[in-house]
Amino acid sequence: MNQQLSVTKRDGQREPLNLDKIHRVITWAAEGLHNVSASQVEIKSHIQFYDGIKTEDIHETIIKAAADLISEEAPDYQYMAARLAIFHLRKKAYGQFEPPRLADHVKRMVENGRYDRHLLDDYSSDEFDQMDEFIDHWRDMNFSYAAVKQLEGKYLVQNRVSGEIYESAQFLYVLVAACLFANYPRDTRMAYIKRFYDATSEFKISLPTPIMSGVRTPTRQFSSCVLIETGDSLDSINATASAIVKYVSQRAGIGINAGRIRALGSPIRNGEAFHTGCIPFYKYFQTAVKSCSQGGVRGGAATLFYPLWHLEVESLLVLKNNRGVEENRVRHLDYGVQFNRLMYQRLVKDDFITLFSPSDVPGLYDAFFADQNEFERLYVQYEQDESIRKKRIKAIELFSLFMQERASTGRIYLQNVDHTNNHSPFDASVAPIRQSNLCLEIALPTKPLQHVNDENGEIALCTLSAFNLGKIESLEDFDELADLAVRALDSLLDYQEYPVPAAYNATMNRRTLGIGVINFAYYLAKHGVKYSDGSANGLVHRTFEAMQYYLMKASVNLAKEKGACPKFNETTYSQGIMPIDTYKKDLDGVCGEPLQQDWDALRAAIKQYGMRNSTLSALMPSETSSQISNATNGIEPPRGFVSIKASKDGVTKQVVPDYENLKDNYELLWNIPSNKGYLELVGIMQKFVDQTISANTNYDPGKFDAGKVPMKQLLQDLLYAYKLGVKTLYYHNTRDGASDNQSDLAAKALKNRDQAQAAEVMVEDDDCAGGACKI
């Protein structure tokens, strides 16, 4: 039978079926791996051979068979499946396993319009040969299967209509480096390209989706996050909508500040008409956000911000829930509700909160961000002024409505605007921060546009990347990595294009970066400490202190070479004020760890040279790019040892790093008794991080009486986060049991119930709904 059947190769030629060839490829993929079996994969794939079967179909069946065998007991199948998938991918891209010469590849891709022509203008064929010398294509074999699927789905340059792929991962990494360092002097740039290539291809620095998929192509917009503030005029609202459309079409996630829009029934033109209120304009923004899919990489998404004291707040808080009718709901945006000290004080004193339309209370909206004492003075004054339209509501009722909607939708976020402005690299009197972004980790100044080309408006962009904490052996490692990350991202600001002048001006003036971390849960497990019991507090304090210190040092060094950013005078750094001076002192009760770095020397250097970047750090979610590095997501605890990720590119399994050695050290999300320990760690990180943190709150109703989380508990966590200086809260996760997919391997472990529930979990990839401000 073996003789009669033939296979159809990729080039269309037919040859006799050779089972030995298939066996050799599978055996090659299993080499050196622990507890995997080539014959097991062959049995599992039970290929139905027929005459003329495509070799491509055989290959895909084998890959799927290996991927299906990934489990806690045999995590190495994720590497076996990955090797088979890499083999397949290279055959698709190059027609063979061996990658071509880099210079030939770049030339061909530029001719086909898939790479940016500047690559050939900036580098000679000899220089590409030099890069070829240090490219290590065997690093492809360090990817897990989940990583290869992400590369294929999101990152590699391809034709998204036909599905053809044109490159493999090492070319991606080296060409990103070549693009970012192209303008460096010829005598130093090759060394930077090599160092940056090594850092990214060895997963020490993790890059965000827009950079991985876009740098080297002709589309030049790589800022993950865009923050746009609207004014209260129709012109400004229209300008905001057009800016949203421009940025959504170019892979960015959007934060919209709509807090200035006046309330329903406000007079227009001295009462000639009355205002339709916020909801029709929110709907307009929602339509703008959903108008484009982000370069085929993900669907558009936005978070919209407004203050808790807005007159329409009771109608705004329910916009996302599934009750109500189409007219009074705007469900496809996420929302960020803004709080400050006075709001919490009214709650604690069981007092009332008074709601106003921002248009009726001159100066109040601006003071809400820029000056807390002035806000309180005006607020009380307006409360007593009988001529002003207002509504009083018990603080506990309003907070309870907020928490109820946050809990039921999971996607109503919170920003403490006083912490955001008091503990900030910007001087709030000249550059207040009035909003955050899609995922709540960015805090940058914005100004409304009056028309889309308004040079006086300010749209904030943030360019992201992250350090993989799993690769940090000593805190001095941050020195080299911070230097590379800051240099590369700073170059990117000059390299990219800006569809809106207000974004170009803001970026050139402030040069804001947001560098975060991935693999935090693995870092804790590796050091034998936990989220829940305070054992990690000292380590986290030392780690984030070192990270911020070396990032600032890198930015000072860059300022020596290239000059400080033009609006450096609007930062608190220019006044000699550091994050270590302005953090919330209540934190000292949680962590008394002394400072380890030489902050005085850094302060002196900043005074002398300034800094190249107004901001340097932000802790973002990293669902996608942490899969590339086979790391845990951002600062989050894993939900299970094996996660099954579902996205538009299919379903993949990923096992937590070093599972076999560290399984007893990992603390899984639903085994953590409360939010207290996690919030304390977030507070410690926030002491050093100059922007903010995508911090989540998690609740398991099964731990409470009658299976319901008491409102008292929700409000306690809210107040505790405020007390620790937490600036923002992102998702509210509720354990519903549905994500704890009991799998057959979990059944074997049922004698240990907690572990059984933790065995495999399904994690929805909400990257399609957003994820632009993730990395």
Segments (PLM) and residue ranges:
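Terminal amphipathic helices with adjacent charged low-complexity linkers/tails
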Residues: 77-110, 339, 420-451, 513, ...
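Catalytic alpha/beta core of large soluble enzyme barrels
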Residues: 124-151, 440-446, 489, 493-494, ...
